[in-house]
Regions:
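Helix-turn-helix
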Residues: 16, 20, 24, 28-61, ...
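Alpha-helical DNA-contacting segments of helix-turn-helix folds
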Residues: 63-70, 134, 138
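Short glycine/proline-centered loop/turn elements that form peptide/ligand docking sites
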Residues: 3-9, 35-37, 45, 59, ...
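Short hydrophobic clusters on alpha-helical segments that form packing/core surfaces
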Residues: 21-29, 70, 74, 103, ...
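Hydrophobic alpha-helical bundle segments that form small-molecule/ligand-binding pockets
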Residues: 83-89, 109-114, 120-125, 135-161, ...
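Hydrophobic alpha-helical connector segments
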Residues: 65, 79-108, 160-164
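N-terminal intrinsically disordered/low-complexity leader segments
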Residues: 1-16, 85, 200
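Hydrophobic/aromatic-rich alpha-helical bundle segments in the mid-to-C-terminal region
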Residues: 119, 128, 147-191
Length: 200
């Protein structure tokens, strides 16, 4: 079963329609989880089911589109954070706090939707590759900051960065999902992994 959109919107009106359909899908998936249907999504968006099917063949395609947007938001937040850290140059604890805050926002703004995407989105090779690309980008940026703050040098920076990113992701998905204090809790957890560098 193909889980990609039927057609890509080219005109602004079509893009607006897709945006409305995906926001409606997000709301219905948040509320109903796996029980969500394309009929309820179309009704929520104010469109006919025929209009929905012009763009999405089934709800799995909508899940994939929502997941793609979530990953794109992750890249955007990471790029903005990288620029901010390059300008502000905080110490290591401040850097960890900045990363933890951005990671937490991605998971706590709409926690029920995030949980649905994590559990129900079809695992395609393209989707796995997209997630890996975001993970690798985060690891690369953390490694840059480890070197900048003098916490790690050489190949050790990549290893430590991978450990920190993996820990952050696992902690947010399995322990802190939906916790409004996730950023503070995650900051403490990540700093505790390297207590000798806490004050650098």
């Amino acid at each position: 079963m193909k889980d990609t959109p039927r057609k890509r919107p080219r005109q602004q009106r079509s893009r607006d329609t897709v945006d409305a359909l995906l926001e409606a899908a997000a709301q219905v998936f948040e509320r109903e989880g796996a029980e969500a249907t394309t009929n309820r999504i179309a009704e929520r968006a104010g469109f006919s089911i025929g209009t929905l099917y012009q763009y999405f063949p089934h709800k799995q395609a909508m899940l994939r589109a929502l997941a793609e947007r979530h990953i794109a938001e992750g890249h955007s937040r990471l790029a903005a954070l990288s620029a901010r850290l390059a300008e502000e140059k905080p110490d290591w604890p401040g850097t960890v706090r900045a990363f933890a805050t951005e990671f937490a926002v991605l998971h706590t703004e709409r926690p029920h939707l995030h949980a649905v995407l994590y559990e129900l989105t079809p695992r395609s090779p393209e989707g796995v590759a997209a997630l890996r690309a975001l993970h690798d980008a985060a690891v690369a940026e953390v490694a840059v900051q480890l070197r900048r703050t003098g916490v790690e040098e050489g190949a050790g920076a990549e290893r430590t960065a991978a450990l920190l990113v993996h820990t952050a992701d696992a902690t947010l998905h399995r322990v802190l999902l939906g916790d409004q204090d996730a950023a503070e809790a995650l900051t403490s957890s990540l700093l505790a992994l390297r207590p000798a560098t806490r004050n650098r």
